[in-house]
């Protein structure tokens, strides 16, 4: 019989893993795990060990694991027609129906959907659209895109440049020249630096910094601004009060397109269909992935607004067929999975559950950790939450990075059979469980997290990193 160790040893020899210390993993000095199944909010490894997946894979398994309806939809579509390209006007029934459903959910002002396979490639498409749009309008110099520090938009050359996290730039010669990064809407630390600044004042400050950057670069060179409604991988940071209204006003003033990256927030995660709806954002372009299929198949998309679509049509009238395409765009199996997934979200009221049970998640996290000696902030929205750890919560001071407090918290949670993610920048533990999560499951997530956090806190106290209470 093939053991778990056998599989991991084989894996070490042949697989290039993302976000992994490649040498340590290949030489057996970093752990591996083979996942064999899942049901609801739990996954199981080859040894039969069961974990609560408090992060829904990577914020993506919105409907939970083991949904036979989606598997059946993929199977039936594979029997009927597994693949044909969608170039030069070719289509398939699932693509048409899924596009109609996405546009219905997105609401007025959105015109068409273009498909890819990942959020990264969707944002590559966004940048090509932005360039093409301005070339058609006779503005070839208007090509710069402003993103935000701590934003996450992918890990390609262009999409990785949009990402505002150091680990995705270092040693890759990123960002590319046309990408800029403005201040993150991260009120928690800014308020500590400038005591007395309200959330509304901080939002105005962020908008002023954006306007300052646009003016410094030259408004005739800045094409677009991209942002997640809620910062995801940058720390699960909901925007401060009034932030998006202030930002949108600046973009309108300088004729800068707004790209809403809904890869994490879309399809119910915030308790609304889209994070844009939750915060009153009016984007020109929207990026989608993850919750679109709940990761039962790879699928991403770009939703193109009316304003942009009119120019794209105009461009092909002048230049001929648009020079962009992916082999797997509009893949029939992915679109079939998307349709089945969105039907489950709608039928079972999972967006409403993300709002209601998500509110309970926020309440329970705050009750458990608001006064904890190493927790500086408890934050979140909908079915997303984060704990930010601090050596001195009153002063909001960071731990020494060498202590690796975030990774230690994540490892301690894993010992409690709970998956919670150590975010890549700062000592932050993130949660984004499936939208199917119940109140009872929230209670279990919080209980396991308490045990993990207390275990690491005790260790830090013994090490002299913090003072005993």
From Swiss-Prot:
Gene3D superfamilies: Aspartate Aminotransferase, domain 1 (3.90.1150.10), Type I PLP-dependent aspartate aminotransferase-like (Major domain) (3.40.640.10). Its cofactor is pyridoxal 5'-phosphate. The keyword Hydrolase does not apply. Its main location: cytoplasm. It holds the Pfam family Aminotran_3. Signal peptide: none annotated. The keyword Protease does not apply. GO terms for molecular function: diaminobutyrate-2-oxoglutarate transaminase activity; pyridoxal phosphate binding. The modification N6-(pyridoxal phosphate)lysine is found at residue 290. Keywords: Aminotransferase, Cytoplasm, Pyridoxal phosphate, Transferase. Involved in the degradation of ectoine, which allows H.elongata to utilize ectoine as both a carbon and a nitrogen source for growth. This is Diaminobutyrate--2-oxoglutarate transaminase. It comes from Halomonas elongata (strain ATCC 33173 / DSM 2581 / NBRC 15536 / NCIMB 2198 / 1H9). The lineage of its organism: Bacteria, Pseudomonadati, Pseudomonadota, Gammaproteobacteria, Oceanospirillales.
